[in-house]
Amino acid sequence: MNKTKLIKIIFVIGVWILLSTFIINIYNENFEIVNYNNNSQSLKKIFQLNGDLKDEKLSIFLIPHSHCDSGWLQDYDWYYNHVVQYILSGIVNELNLDKEKKFNWVEIGGWVQNDEATATIDDVITQMTQGHQWLKDTLNYTIEYAWQIDPFGYSSSTPTIFSSMGIKGLIINRVSDDVKSYMKSAKEMEFIWKGSESLGEQSQMLVSTLNVHYDYPKHIDPKKDFSLEERVKGFTKYIKDLSNTRESSILMIPLGDDFRYSNAKNEFSVSKEWLKVIQDNKEKYNIKEIKYATIDEYFIALEDEFMNKLGKTVEENLKTGFSSTLSLYNKDFFPYSTGDLEYWTGYYTTRPLLKRLIRESSLLQKSSDILYTLAIGENSNNQIDINNLQTLSNQLNENRNTIALVQHHDIVTGTSRSFVLNDNFQRLQKSRISNYNIISNSLEYLLNKDNNNNENTDSTNEPFNFENVIDLSNEINNQYSLVFHNTLGWEVNQHVSFRIKVNKNDNQLLESIQLVEAISNKTIQIQIIPIQDDSNCQSIENNYIVFAIINLPPLGLNTYYLSISSNEDSKPNTILSKPKLLKKGNEINFNNNRFKVEFESNGLISKITDKNSNEIKTIEQTFHQYSTKKSGPYIFNVKGGKKHGFLENPDKFIYHDGPLVSQLTMLYGVDDGCNVTSIVVQRIYKNNEIDNSNSKSLITENYIETGYSINGDMNRETTINYKVKDLENDDIFYTDNGLESRKRIYNHDRTVNQNYYPVLGYIKLKETSENNNHQYTVYVDRSVGATSPSDGEMEIMIHRTMDTDDWKGVNWPSKDIGRSDAKLYFNMDLVNNQLQNEKRISLHITNQPIMFVKKHNNQTGYLLKYSPLSNQLPSNIHLQSLLTLKNNTVGLRLFNIHEVDSNTQSTTDTDKSTLFNELEISNFIETGLSFLKLTKNNLIDKYSTRINKKFPVKCGESEYSFINEKPSSIIFSNNGTNNIIDGENKGENNKTIETIQIKPHEIKSFTFNFNFQLDQIIPNNNNYAINKELNNEYIEQSIENQRYEYDFSFFPIKPTFYDDRGKYNRPNHLALILSLSIGTPAGILIIVIALVVIYKKRKNRKTLTSSYSLLNLILKDRADSSP
């Protein structure tokens, strides 16, 4: 090898070594914390290189914090036992040793930091209330400023809810990269956020946005290997850049990250060194102060500066570059993106079964809270009963904590490791069983009024049980009491369904089943449909659905008797719907008082006639799947994938018809046994007893119900689509945020996944043509993602699973191949009608009656029907919460959903109503939304604001504004000695009157106490007759394990969780780069050497060949010349 070649090789190796060293330094984030000595010469050099940061002196608030997820890569208990307890103990020790140090914990004061796209407003309010109440009870502290820095986008309901809880300022973080870049350049990182146009300033709050993320700035991170000189230089550059992105001179800098400060002493010690250098040189940087601080201190300083500058002239503010107004933002921050291919829209749907179970468990919790509270109130004169019931209060609060826990932004989203989600699923199951027990006991204390009736207190009187399937086998001589609970403040008349099982397929036996309303002794119409006609399906053999129309009083209970009649003279009003096998789905139509529904040959909807308006619309209902290898638990990415048709050709059509229900069931993937891969159930509810010309349709008649049961298909993201032919909606559609509808615009410059938005209750389209004013709404039973990809089309994602990760933190694929049973509800109506009805329909769907069952022969002494309200609430006032807090204080929330005609709302009050029928209450006080003292933000109306029309988010504002509408007035009156605010206001018969006014889209909260009649309380002594006793642990785990999600379900609920602890074999980017840095030059070198060798071999071979040829010629010549 010559000298030149050797030099070249050495050069290549040297470049590789330098490159490798550089890469290692970039990627190494786990160096031990190192202390450095102060070097005055180096510091002088830093100050010479950096100029002044800003003309106006800066106040810098350093926010030490640790973002501790309650479940993500590890479960709740692991995080606490291995990390969190050490963070807390270390921090407390550091704060005790040095009063200058500060630390920020619990962030928003809630039980968790909730997600904002998939958690319902009821659940958000619950988790916030649980945290705020705990802080007040335990530490006597009330949250005023919040730190909501990790949800993946922000809902417009947040400023509305938070401001109603007394929160005045909010720090946010995960705003789309392009939006945040604009906010920085326009100096709009601080702004006023308005949550609702109808509430105006009442829903506004001051918001500050983090520049990058909630972690340490790079150069001052104690885990990063920088010298003191580099730390100071990097920090000063950081604050210079930071100060140029906002109007104010008040800067907030986070010092922390996920689960930081497990060694609090070391973290503070590193920060102490560079902080001292900055503090000693404040004047050189125009720094007024720099210190450890809390969020409260930062916002108070920020507010003071804004108030001070708003009092100055424009000329004075121009000298400091300060605009005299703050930007007013009235939209939301969805979808969240971190790049063109990274739109975080997949988690809107990820883990659909878990999302459904969370919502279902939340409704059960609401029922438990209401019934327990009413049981306490109704037994206020019996000390023994009160004492017994109060033993359930700890269980009740723990169950609320579980509901609060699963609202975390990595649980309800489905973006945790699978074993973590399984842990939360088990917690939900435990809370459900506990709530079954609480409801059972509360029902006993509410309905069993004859305490002296031994027959109702002995062992033969079974408790109220949760029965997912009522087993009527061998029950000819017995009957069941079915008690339905209505959690709504309105009277309910609607269809309900429940499952039964008999011991044989006996039509005569089935037709002998009867349902009787207990209070009227009236036999009511029922319709029975078999769930499966195949006798090979033993798990659901002889399982049937029973349909009925029931009446429930507001917030009340009604009892129905279910039995098999053995009396030949008795004539049950029962219809057994026999199955009819169809060759095609278009052989039949559905009809009820509201709609006529026609189907395609594959059984999916093709045309709907609205009988109220005689409007006929072609509706194309289809299922589709996106195939992709780029998506993950967070991100939905269609790049490189295709959209395919799905569930296009059923194997079997089964039709059932009757007086209450028409149902078409389609089975897919049918084998010789009972297994099917997918099920679709089309259903319409009917009530042939009413005269449509004079009576309103039942609320269940106002939609066409589509049920489906599908498995997760690998690397598929499944949607259901409704396309209304000839509908022009100009790319505008609407989704609800739980409080109100928000306007969305489909951007055709972006891909479909970039146009997805979260849906909590419904998605809808409205016709924009002058000749038509119809609205088309699809209601959902859980949180989903949805969009409108073309005129007249609504696309809803219903399931997704993949064997790839999106590398946004979970570091494991979301392999959810489990079955999801769900329902969607399609409605078409006039826009004005839906203005009155859409929210009520959504609330009815999400607040279905809850049924409990008691098997016994004697109902003596039991109330058969019960309601605590003297009248139902006005049609636009929703009773959102009724629950018992500590010390028997009761919390009440009322929500004005504004579902009334806007033309009449401004001129008339809603119905006047007393609150409770017989229960006496006192200390009726209006509170904040988390039941703490009501506080008003006295600064919010003093800010001068402007709307920036250039802001890059172009949709997400309120659909309607009712800011000028008259509030609804509700008059609550109560007998006796009430101590209500404005207690002097007395009406007839010495009743205390309280008038409450609630604005459209406003939630108002109150606390009160039941009046315990101490002079009437029965003492706890042996002279008292047998008391009702608490029934404990009567629900077996197996019952919950064998629960069916819906009446049509073939398969019990079975989530597919798996053990994904540890590291996933993801692509190692560091190794990849190192291998490229080594492999590329080495590969080139090898190729060059190989080419040289080949060249030399060929050259030698050519030379040798030439020599042989020459030799042959010589030999030939010699041969020719020889004699």
UniProtKB/Swiss-Prot annotation:
CDD domains: GH38N_AMII_euk. This is Alpha-mannosidase E. The active site is at 150 (nucleophile). InterPro entries: Gal_mutarotase_sf_dom, Glyco_hydro/deAcase_b/a-brl, Glyco_hydro_38_C, Glyco_hydro_38_cen, Glyco_hydro_38_cen_sf, Glyco_hydro_38_N, Glyco_hydro_38_N_sf, Glyco_hydro_57/38_cen_sf. Zn(2+) binds at residues 67, 69, 150, 409. Binds 1 zinc ion per subunit. It is a single-pass type I membrane protein. It holds the Pfam family Glyco_hydro_38C. Keywords: Glycoprotein, Glycosidase, Hydrolase, Membrane, Metal-binding, Signal, Transmembrane, Transmembrane helix, Zinc. One of its GO terms (biological process) is mannose metabolic process. It catalyses: Hydrolysis of terminal, non-reducing alpha-D-mannose residues in alpha-D-mannosides. Glycans are attached at residues 2, 38, 140, 521, 675, 858, 887, 975, 990. Its EC number is 3.2.1.24. Coiled coil: none annotated. Residues 1094-1123 are cytoplasmic. Residues 22-1072 are extracellular. Belongs to the glycosyl hydrolase 38 family. The gene is manE. GO terms for cellular component: lysosome; membrane. The chain crosses the membrane at residues 1073-1093. Its cofactor is Zn(2+). The lineage of its organism: Eukaryota, Amoebozoa, Evosea, Eumycetozoa, Dictyostelia. Residues 1-21 form the signal peptide. It is found in: Membrane. It is an enzyme of class 3 (hydrolase). SMART domains: Alpha-mann_mid (SM00872). One of its GO terms (molecular function) is metal ion binding.
